Regions:
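Acidic, polar-rich low-complexity tracts and alpha-helical solenoid repeat scaffolds
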Residues: 1-124
Length: 124
């Protein structure tokens, strides 16, 4: 069960995003991760950090990939993991133009999360 403090710190980071956008939310989310490495929210925190990395101008693809990768590889049972893998697929395909890597992410998504909403995007 997360402590009130931990819950508050996580909420602060998300509120920073709601109020000030991704740019304002990156530092509080990084602080949350640094101070609460074993939090029940940790996989979500890395996921949101990756989303913020994508949402800023200029987009920080390197950090986004790193943080989505942490969710996908270290927290494969997280509810955010399928989305993280899908985002990695999109970045590989659209940004890095690396079809080999994109196909690896697609295969991983279909194999590990066949019932996910993200997997269904490939079945249309």
């Amino acid at each position: 069960e997360p402590s009130e403090l931990e819950k508050a710190a996580y909420t602060v980071a998300l509120d920073a995003y709601k109020q000030g956008g991704a740019k304002k939310a990156i530092a509080p989310m990084q602080n949350f991760i640094k101070n609460n490495p074993n939090s029940v929210y940790i996989s979500n925190a890395y996921f949101w950090l990756a989303e913020f990395n994508l949402a800023i101008e200029p987009t920080n693809y390197a950090e986004a990939k790193k943080n989505y990768g942490i969710v996908a590889n270290q927290y494969p049972n997280s509810s955010r993991a399928p989305r993280a893998v899908y985002q990695l697929y999109n970045i590989a395909k659209e940004v890095d133009k690396n079809s080999t890597q994109a196909n690896q992410y697609k295969a991983k998504l279909l194999k590990q999360y066949p019932k996910s909403e993200e997997a269904s995007f490939f079945k249309k």
